[in-house]
């Protein structure tokens, strides 16, 4: 099951609803796994581009420790989107996400965005060197299960 409502620090009270939905999905499906794919409130979020402050790695760790504590047992897979932070910060966030997932007994995937947020036209395909850098950062942080995000604009 993919619980698709993206939660973040602004909507962290949704985590209790997530827990209920996750438990319900497991109950009606015979215990199938549930997954969330939230975003990191980094420098490339729309809110930060509009003047909000990006979360530091430590602030991210504190906020997501609380959120994941609320959903522990109801969410099995944590797959943070990786496109909302700068490339030089990505590894640090990946390490924190992996440690939090391990703490709460969740599988940890990275949701590798295959479009480029660094371009003024949203969202062009990412250059291969950037994609490779993301994959390498995930590998160094101990991830063995990347997934991919892609939007089709018509």
Model regions: which residues?
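Glycan-processing catalytic domains of CAZymes
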Residues: 2-154
């Amino acid at each position: 099951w993919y619980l698709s409502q993206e939660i973040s620090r602004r909507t962290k009270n949704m985590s209790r609803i997530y827990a209920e939905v996750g438990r319900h999905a497991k109950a009606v499906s015979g215990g199938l796994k549930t997954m969330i794919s939230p975003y990191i409130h980094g420098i490339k979020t729309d809110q930060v581009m509009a003047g909000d402050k990006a979360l530091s790695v430590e602030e991210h760790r504190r906020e997501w420790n609380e959120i994941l504590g609320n959903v522990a047992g109801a969410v099995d897979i944590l797959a943070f989107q990786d496109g909302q932070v700068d490339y030089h910060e990505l590894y640090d966030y990946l390490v924190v996400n992996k440690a939090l997932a391990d703490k709460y007994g969740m599988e940890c995937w990275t949701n590798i965005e295959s479009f480029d947020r660094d371009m003024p036209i949203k969202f062009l395909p990412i250059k291969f060197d950037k994609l490779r850098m993301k994959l390498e950062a995930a590998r160094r942080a101990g991830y063995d299960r990347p997934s991919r995000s892609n939007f089709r604009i018509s």
